[in-house]
């Protein structure tokens, strides 16, 4: 038989192991190497690291690390998902405290029960919606068990949730509040809890973020203590007055400030400024202007400003002093309409809207204007003031002669102009200056047949520009043939010293030829005035511009003797910048009338005797000084 595979004995045959025994030749007294331990036995430990397995271990470690990292990430994602799903099931701290009291109560006290603890089911105000899978009842029972378990653990002190809440920072608390459905209501509630006054009692709300105001009331939440201390100094360069209060709570420092800035700002600008100075989000701020006419709000700022809880910088706003300082309460007076009428008369303010707006702006310095704002019938007061002012101005104008009126208009213009621009323009239009002065002299005096001047010419020759500049200086009236269908289109002539009809066309000349011949003559005419009987008056001097020379047109022969015609043949000149070469402004007309005063024969007998004003200053109030606030 053949030999079996393998070997029969150890080390037998040609393929066996060779046993080699080392022979150490050592004699007594030879030195033994420090690396050798003669007494130790050969255990084979020196052969442990004979084979290098580092690469195997490193690969295994990397695989285990990646698996652990993936497991940690998955666990974190699952925890967040569970937290989102069970957020509404977390019990509030107040319920935990009440449960602790119930669990720690003594058996005797617990046996005493006033309420009837019925075990029957009650109707729920907020029922859980059915998921559609029929597991709503099971989920509700599990939720109750979880809440009871959390309550028990929080009462026994063995759960870590309570310790985590104690370690929460103020910033984390305020962020949790802002994540709620109504963060503004939470901040308003915290403000009232700390300061004992509602924030809405101190402010008047602005709906728009673009509305500007100089005074602003701000409540800031979640401010750190160091920032609150430094903010007192950082805010001063931006404001004229600041009133700062700060109280600490679980949210951090809650600051209340009343600030008057150096210029008017809107809410967006203030949010950006305070976000940079306080290092908090704009969602942590309540920014509104203060109540300016609330005595209670003014007293709050006044009293807290004197206490040690406030830091005040700058001069106290006048609206606080007006409602708190005793002297200002003595100066409060009743409204006097005559003072308002006198103010409107002196400032030539006769439009109702302008009277209301400008007089309200004087409330900070005029006690009568302040009383006007406190009145409940401001609209009626404004209407009465405008009506009386127009009556006084109308009567004053009627008593003045044309020379007195031109002198009063010259006194209204403060600048000094150049009369030569008007003369150069007339020469440019080929009009003799002497003939124009003669016609203007008779025109201003209202001499019959010379009471109307017609400026005729081609388009773009400066007819309307010349006439409008003269009417603007003399504060005349403008009538338009477009309103001729109305019975009252000539009514402005009743209160004017001079009138103008611009761009008369063929239908307009037909109307003048049929109905206004007496008006062109300068004779008394009857004019229909709204809400009054027919008014008889002498028609004021009338200046007409037209492209039609009605003074020579055969269609209107009866107007030839009633019109003084001047023709403008040349186009109006402009410089390379588009500005008029000849400036026809109020100051140049003032210089023109001052220069030609004697040539126009505007002097009167009483003016020669007395160079002063013939009319004294009008007064509708008794002489007294206006008391300022």
From Swiss-Prot:
The protein's UniProt keywords, in alphabetical order, are:
ATP-binding, DNA replication, DNA-binding, Early protein, Helicase, Host nucleus, Hydrolase, Isomerase, Isopeptide bond, Nucleotide-binding, Phosphoprotein, Ubl conjugation
Q: Which residues form the SF3 helicase domain?
A: 431-581
* Disulfide bonds, paired cysteine numbers: none
Location of motif Nuclear export signal in this chain is: 105-114
Q: Which reaction does it catalyse?
A: Couples ATP hydrolysis with the unwinding of duplex DNA by translocating in the 3'-5' direction; ATP + H2O = ADP + phosphate + H(+)
**Location(s), subcellular:** Host nucleus
What does this protein's UniProt record list under function? Answer: ATP-dependent DNA 3'-5' helicase required for initiation of viral DNA replication. It forms a complex with the viral E2 protein. The E1-E2 complex binds to the replication origin which contains binding sites for both proteins. During the initial step, a dimer of E1 interacts with a dimer of protein E2 leading to a complex that binds the viral origin of replication with high specificity. Then, a second dimer of E1 displaces the E2 dimer in an ATP-dependent manner to form the E1 tetramer.
What is the protein name stated in its UniProt record?
A: Replication protein E1
Q: Which organism is it from?
A: Human papillomavirus 31
Encoding gene, per UniProt annotation: E1
């Amino acid at each position: 038989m053949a030999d079996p595979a393998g070997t029969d004995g150890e080390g037998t045959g040609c393929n066996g192991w060779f046993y080699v025994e080392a022979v150490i030749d050592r004699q007594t007294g030879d030195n033994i190497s420090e690396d050798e331990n003669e007494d130790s036995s050969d255990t084979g430990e020196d052969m442990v690291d004979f084979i290098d397995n580092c690469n195997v271990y490193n690969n295994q470690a990397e695989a285990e690390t990646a698996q652990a990292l993936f497991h940690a990430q998955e666990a974190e994602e699952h925890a967040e998902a569970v937290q989102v799903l069970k957020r509404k099931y977390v019990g509030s701290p107040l319920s935990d405290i009440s449960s602790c009291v119930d669990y720690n109560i003594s058996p005797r006290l617990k046996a005493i029960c006033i309420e009837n603890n019925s075990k029957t089911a009650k109707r729920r105000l907020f029922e859980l919606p059915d998921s559609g899978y029929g597991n709503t009842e099971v989920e509700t029972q599990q939720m109750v068990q979880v809440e009871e378990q959390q309550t028990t653990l929080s009462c026994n002190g063995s759960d870590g949730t309570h310790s985590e809440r104690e370690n929460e920072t103020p910033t984390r608390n305020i962020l949790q509040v802002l994540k709620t459905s109504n963060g503004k209501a939470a901040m308003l509630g915290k403000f009232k809890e700390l300061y004992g006054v509602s924030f809405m009692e101190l402010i008047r709300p602005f709906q728009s973020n673009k509305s500007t105001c100089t005074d602003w009331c701000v409540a800031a939440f979640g401010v750190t203590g160091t920032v609150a201390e430094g903010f007192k100094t950082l805010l001063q360069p931006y404001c004229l007055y600041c009133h700062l209060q700060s109280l600490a709570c679980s949210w951090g420092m809650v600051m209340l400030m009343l600030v008057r800035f150096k210029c008017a700002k809107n809410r967006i600008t203030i949010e950006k400024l305070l976000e940079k100075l306080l290092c908090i989000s704009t969602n942590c701020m309540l920014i509104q202007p203060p109540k300016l006419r609330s005595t209670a709000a003014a007293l709050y700022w006044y009293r807290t400003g004197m206490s040690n809880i406030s830091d005040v910088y700058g001069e106290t706003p006048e609206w606080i002093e007006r409602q708190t300082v005793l002297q200002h309460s003595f100066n409060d007076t009743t409204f006097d309409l005559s003072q308002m009428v006198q103010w409107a008369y002196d400032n030539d303010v006769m439009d109702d809207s302008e009277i209301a707006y400008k007089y309200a702006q004087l409330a900070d310095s005029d006690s009568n204007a302040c009383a006007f704002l406190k009145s409940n019938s401001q609209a009626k007061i404004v209407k009465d003031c405008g009506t009386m002012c127009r009556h006084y101005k109308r009567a004053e104008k009627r008593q003045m002669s044309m020379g007195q009126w031109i002198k009063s208009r010259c006194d209204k213009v403060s600048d000094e102009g150049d009369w030569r621009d008007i003369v150069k323009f007339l020469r440019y239009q080929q009009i003799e200056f002497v003939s124009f002065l003669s016609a203007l002299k008779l025109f201003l005096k209202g001499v019959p047949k010379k009471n109307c001047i017609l400026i005729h010419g081609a388009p773009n020759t400066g007819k309307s520009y010349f006439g409008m500049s003269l009417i603007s200086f003399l504060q005349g009236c403008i009538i338009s043939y477009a309103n001729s269908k109305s019975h009252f289109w000539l009514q402005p002539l009743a209160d004017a010293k001079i009138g103008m009809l611009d761009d008369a066309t063929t239908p307009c000349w037909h109307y003048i030829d049929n109905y206004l011949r007496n008006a062109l003559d300068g004779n008394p005419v009857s004019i229909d005035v709204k809400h009054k009987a027919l008014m008889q008056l002498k028609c004021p001097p009338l200046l007409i511009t037209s492209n039609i020379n009605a003074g020579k047109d055969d269609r209107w022969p009866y107007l030839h003797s009633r019109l003084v015609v001047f023709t403008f043949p040349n186009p109006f000149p402009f410089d390379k910048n588009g500005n008029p070469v000849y400036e026809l402004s109020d100051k140049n007309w003032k210089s023109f009338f001052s220069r030609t005063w004697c040539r126009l024969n505007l002097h009167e007998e009483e003016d020669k005797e007395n160079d002063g004003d013939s009319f004294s200053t009008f007064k509708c109030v008794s002489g007294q000084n206006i008391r300022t606030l």
